């Protein structure tokens, strides 16, 4: 009986694909070696412990219908589009070893005519006259008895969009600049014009089979019917939920300030698990009562633009004479946290 399992997703939904990955990882026998191949439509994928409001331009993402997906592994934020080929290798311990999966990906690239090397902990790079350029990045997750290595191969990704949706660390930005960060990345189509997602998947699959000396038929995973995976519906519901993607952010504080014709306003929020735990309002408005009431009502509110707007507009019942101010305030808060 084979110890290999090959799964290929025909969905571009990041929440679907990450839910499939999670279910397979949790229920696989410890003796199995799994390769899962997939790709996502426009998505920012963040690490398990990251704050989306800090890492991403959430307002621009909403405008452009770019999804946010939190993965279960650590590491940084990345932008996925259909120009990325994603892979996940899984194995039980003690066999799990990320150097094996890295070797398989390097062998696949080599078979296509691309000589790449592992660099640092997470990257695969190719040497060019301009220096090393990254063609793959990875992240890892381990539990007591198993582990996985997942990553992307940059096939024909729209690299310019990295700068639009990801807010780089200001120190990195000052030191390197957006252009130099972008120049360190390369698409495989620059090295192999015409290369396709299907060809990359075939190369990785063949290298996987060769390494283990076994072959197995691929299982195609489709959203057209619920995958036959234990607890998939619950896992997908969690993976696609606001509570997981936004609410799992580490505790943080947010300061908003604005000057209106009727006065200046400063809002201080403390947020834990996507919920406002403390709100303070400072203002030089001649009528601070509605703002003081707002601070009280915001405690316990979800840190979501629509919920903040609802809370603000609910004050119109108690303060109808301040309708103009409250509507301006409501629109500003919603825009500031979107």
Swiss-Prot record:
Q: Kindly give any further remark recorded in the entry.
A: In the transfer reaction, the free carboxyl group of lipoic acid is attached via an amide linkage to the epsilon-amino group of a specific lysine residue of lipoyl domains of lipoate-dependent enzymes.
Q: Write down what this protein is called.
A: Lipoate-protein ligase A
Q: Which family does it belong to?
A: Belongs to the LplA family.
The source organism is Salmonella newport (strain SL254)
Q: What does this protein do?
A: Catalyzes both the ATP-dependent activation of exogenously supplied lipoate to lipoyl-AMP and the transfer of the activated lipoyl onto the lipoyl domains of lipoate-dependent enzymes.
* Residues engaged in binding ATP: 71, 76-79, 134
One GO cellular component assignment for this chain's record is: cytosol
Catalyzed chemical reaction(s): L-lysyl-[lipoyl-carrier protein] + (R)-lipoate + ATP = N(6)-[(R)-lipoyl]-L-lysyl-[lipoyl-carrier protein] + AMP + diphosphate + H(+)
Please state the gene responsible for encoding this protein. Answer: lplA
List all disulphide bridges recorded for this chain: none
């Amino acid at each position: 009986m084979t110890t290999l399992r090959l799964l290929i997703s025909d969905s571009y939904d990041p929440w679907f694909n990450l839910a499939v990955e999670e279910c397979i990882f949790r229920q696989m026998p410890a003796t199995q070696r799994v390769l899962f191949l997939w790709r996502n439509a426009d998505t920012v994928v963040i690490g398990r412990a990251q704050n989306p409001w800090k890492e991403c331009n959430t307002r621009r993402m909403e405008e452009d219908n770019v999804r946010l997906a939190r993965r279960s592994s650590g590491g940084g934020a990345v932008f996925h589009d259909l120009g990325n080929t994603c892979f996940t290798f899984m194995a039980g311990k003690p066999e799990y070893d990320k150097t094996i999966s890295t070797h398989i990906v390097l062998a696949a690239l080599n078979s296509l005519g691309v000589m790449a090397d592992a660099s640092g902990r997470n990257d695969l790079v190719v040497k060019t006259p301009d220096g090393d350029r990254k063609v793959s990045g990875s992240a890892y997750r381990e539990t007591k008895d198993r582990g996985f290595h997942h990553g992307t191969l940059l096939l024909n990704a729209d690299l310019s969009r990295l700068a639009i949706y990801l807010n780089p660390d200001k120190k990195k930005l000052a030191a390197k600049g957006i252009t130099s960060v972008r120049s360190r990345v390369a698409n495989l189509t620059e090295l192999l014009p015409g290369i396709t997602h299907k060809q990359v998947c075939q190369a990785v699959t063949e290298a996987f089979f060769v390494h283990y000396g076994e072959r197995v038929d691929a299982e195609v995973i489709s959203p057209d019917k619920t995958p036959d995976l234990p607890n998939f519906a619950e896992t997908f519901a969690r993976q696609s939920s606001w509570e997981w993607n936004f609410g799992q952010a580490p505790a943080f504080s947010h300061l908003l300030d604005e000057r209106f014709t009727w006065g200046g306003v400063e809002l201080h929020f403390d947020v834990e698990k996507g919920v406002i735990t403390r709100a303070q309002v400072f203002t030089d408005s001649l009528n601070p009562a509605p703002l003081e009431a707002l601070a009280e009502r915001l405690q316990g509110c979800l840190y979501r633009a629509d919920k903040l707007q609802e809370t603000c507009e609910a004050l119109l019942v108690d303060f109808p004479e301040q309708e103009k101010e409250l509507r301006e305030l409501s629109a500003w808060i919603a825009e500031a946290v979107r």
